[in-house]
Amino acid sequence: MTTSSPLLAAKIGARARELGCEALDAPVSGGDVGARDAKLTIMAGGPETAFKLAEPLFAAMGKEWKLQGPWGAGQHTKMANQIAIASNMMGVCEALAYARAAGLDPRRVPKASPAARRAA
């Protein structure tokens, strides 16, 4: 349940299969608040049999969990999520820089902008 390399996840999954074990890669989104409140989003990769076995654990930790594909797919999904988050953060930074350059108080702009409030 960590964010790591999709290649490493596939290697761990293959080794688990050799040993007769089940394995998933299952990175999460939601941070420490999501973990504390059992509201994590869990992005899993691996066999459906392993996913079904892990669902009671996921239900105790999260609000949403999806099997994304084979081993490594959870890691790839987490990376895609991080790209989306980073681009939103960059957009907010650009908007505030623009506001400042236009002579506005950048602390006031998010209060009047629904898009900035959602992203912040």
Regions found by a protein language model. Give the residues of each.
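Rossmann-fold dinucleotide-binding core
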Residues: 3-82
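Helical "substrate-binding/catalytic lid" subdomain
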Residues: 73-120
